A protein has these predicted regions:
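Conserved donor-nucleotide/metal-binding helix-loop-beta segment in metal-dependent transferases, i.e.
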Residues: 114-139
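Phosphate- and divalent-cation-binding pockets in alpha/beta enzyme and binding domains
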Residues: 14, 61-62, 115, 179, ...
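Catalytic-core segments of class I nucleotidyltransferases/pyrophosphorylases
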Residues: 120-121, 149-243
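A structural signal for short hydrophobic beta-strand segments in well-ordered beta-sheet cores
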Residues: 26, 143-145, 208
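Active-site metal-binding loops of divalent metal-dependent hydrolases
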Residues: 11, 109-110
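Conserved N-terminal catalytic core of the sugar/cofactor nucleotidyltransferase
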Residues: 2-6, 14-17, 28, 32-107, ...
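Arg/Gly-rich low-complexity intrinsically disordered repeat tracts
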Residues: 243-262
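Hydrophobic/aromatic residue at the end of a short beta strand that borders the catalytic acidic motif
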Residues: 106, 112-113, 172
Length: 262
């Protein structure tokens, strides 16, 4: 079984002053709140049990917007992340909830055109990252690959070893939590997801897939605008971004109640 986690914390400082009044993941991307898009990525991949991790001041806003998930045919659980401990720390909060299941982790500001259902269905153990060819690789975590192996990941390198950016979508087995517990904070005082991924690489259990469609991390004004324009363009030729809760998404959860974990 695969569970899903949407990480929707952070201060959104690059989107001030908008994020002084709301969480950045609630800002509009074309005609829907940003968080609808990562949720849709998980839903179309067949994942129905999803946790949203956010800060104390924002969890209530997500609960008001999304509720139990019944409207979207899913079961939602909410987890509070105190402070800014990093992506890996936020993921670690879900250990009890995930149990022994595999988990798909997606950053709440990442928007994907690709359908990842095949990648999820073929995943069994270890870890898997999703890469995208970019022209400005120095802005991202960059994967060095050879054949079907990932040799390493370097965060925002001055001289990238490839043009393959590591997107904000990761698949892990339950062993990820033991790795997180062994991490030490980086120079910025956070537990880094790149360190988690490199641990799997050293074990030889990291897989990868290269995305073909549009991808954006809508964390700046420029990328937010670009994401809105691209979503609108995709709308014109398909229903890929119809979004959770639209008529094509059937409700299948019954009277599920949202769980808020603290």
């Amino acid at each position: 079984m695969m569970k899903g986690i949407v990480l929707a914390g952070g201060t959104g400082s690059r989107l001030h002053p908008l994020t002084k009044v709301t969480n950045k993941h609630l800002l509009p991307v074309y005609d829907k709140p940003m968080i609808y898009y990562p949720l849709q990525t998980l839903i179309t991949a067949g994942i129905k049990d999803i946790m949203i991790v956010s800060g104390r001041g924002h969890v209530g806003h997500f609960l008001e917007l999304l509720g139990s998930g019944k409207e979207f045919g899913i079961q939602l659980t909410y987890e509070i992340q105190e402070g800014a401990g990093g992506i890996a720390q936020a993921l670690g909060l879900a250990e009890e909830w995930v149990g022994m299941d595999n988990v798909a982790v997606i950053l709440g500001d990442n928007i994907f055109q690709d359908d990842i259902q095949g990648g999820i269905e073929s995943f069994e153990s270890g870890a898997k990252i999703f890469l995208k060819e970019v022209s400005d690789a120095h802005r991202f975590g960059v994967a060095e690959v050879k054949g079907n192996k990932v040799l390493g990941i370097e965060e925002k390198p001055k001289i990238p070893k490839s043009n393959l950016a590591v997107t904000g979508l990761y698949l892990y087995d339950a062993g990820v939590f033991a790795i997180i517990k062994m991490l030490k904070p980086s120079s910025r005082g956070e537990l880094e997801i790149t360190d988690v991924n490199n641990a799997y690489i050293r074990r030889g259990t990291m897989e990868f897939a290269v995305l073909k469609g549009f991808w954006s991390d809508a964390g700046t004004f420029e990328s937010l605008l670009r994401a809105s324009v691209m979503v609108r363009g995709v709308y014109a030729i398909s229903d890929r971004f119809a979004g959770p809760g639209t008529p094509d998404v059937e409700s299948r959860v019954g009277d599920a109640k949202p769980g808020i974990r603290e």
